[in-house]
């Protein structure tokens, strides 16, 4: 599969952060393949135009990856992308609410995107909408009660065609070990586990599970992937210099070529 889209998104993430001096680079990098796989899945079905209205990024601090993808889709202009994080720009450090620009659900406070996704999915199933409801949840969001309340509701409403991607980049482990938490999730809900940086695996899971049953996809990822320097807590909210970004871009190109 062509890796150019992942490369382009990461290049744009780095430039946005350099320009704005704001953002979470490593957290955005860890979800890039998940986002790209969801887009490719819909695009192959001729439904790419439904991405924005059927996707919620619950871990809103990874929004620069979403901005990068939406820029590649033509939903955000280059001029707007250059103003990310600047005064007067609607493209802020977490997912904004701006339906006229294809941002339908704002997120930032952890644990909010999953319940909103379930509510939206439930209503859409009643109206005959057959497109899955996609949501990316961070591993740290499993510390939030709203996530567990929603998981229990997903058992009550098991056929809402939810596709819940857990970005298990181990970020939360530096505070609270999550391994046994995810063992509990696997026992209680239909769950599959994939390499969150392997697009073929993610696409295969989506294609092989084209049913109305809700599905949790545990994506094992690395913060800052594929940059080794970023896979540590120091880079959670650190901004690269332009020189560092240039070096990172070369490393990304080399990795994906």
Go through each PLM region and give its residues.
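Short acidic, glycine/serine/threonine-rich loops at helix termini
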Residues: 67-69, 96, 146-148, 174-178, ...
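Cofactor-binding active-site loop characterized by glycine-rich and histidine/acidic residues
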Residues: 13-19, 23, 28-157
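Conserved thiamine diphosphate
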Residues: 129-130, 176-205, 253-256
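Generic beta-sheet signal
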Residues: 53-55, 131-135, 162, 211-221
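Glycine-rich beta-alpha junction loops
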Residues: 33, 61-62, 168-170, 198, ...
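A short alpha/beta connector and helix-capping loop motif
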Residues: 144-169, 214-220
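Glycine/aspartate-rich loop-and-adjacent alpha/beta segment that forms the canonical ThDP
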Residues: 199, 203-257
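N-terminal hydrophobic or amphipathic helices/low-complexity stretches enriched
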Residues: 1-9
């Amino acid at each position: 599969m062509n890796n150019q889209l992942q490369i382009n998104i990461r290049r744009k993430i780095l430039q946005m952060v350099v320009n704005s001096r704001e953002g979470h680079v490593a957290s955005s990098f860890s979800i890039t393949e998940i986002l790209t796989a969801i887009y490719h899945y819909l695009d192959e079905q001729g439904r790419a135009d439904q991405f924005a209205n059927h996707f919620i990024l619950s871990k809103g601090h990874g929004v620069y990856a979403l901005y990068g993808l939406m820029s590649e889709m033509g939903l955000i202009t280059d001029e707007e992308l250059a103003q990310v994080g600047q005064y007067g720009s609607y493209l802020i450090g977490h997912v904004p609410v701006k339906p006229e620009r294809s941002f339908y659900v704002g997120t930032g406070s952890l644990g909010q995107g999953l319940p909103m996704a379930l509510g939206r999915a439930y209503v859409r199933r009643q109206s005959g909408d057959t497109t899955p409801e996609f949501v990316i949840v961070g591993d740290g969001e499993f510390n939030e009660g709203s996530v567990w309340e929603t998981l229990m509701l997903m058992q009550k409403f098991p056929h809402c065609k939810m596709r819940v991607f857990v970005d298990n980049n181990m970020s939360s482990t530096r505070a609270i070990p999550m391994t046994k938490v995810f063992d509990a999730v696997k026992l209680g809900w239909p769950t599959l586990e994939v390499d969150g940086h392997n697009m073929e695996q993610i696409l295969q899971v989506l294609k092989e599970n084209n049913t109305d049953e809700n599905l949790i996809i545990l994506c094992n990822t690395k913060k800052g992937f594929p940059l080794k320097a970023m896979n540590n807590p120091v880079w959670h909210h650190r901004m690269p210099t332009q020189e560092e970004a240039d070096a990172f871009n070369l490393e990304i190109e080399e990795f994906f070529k």
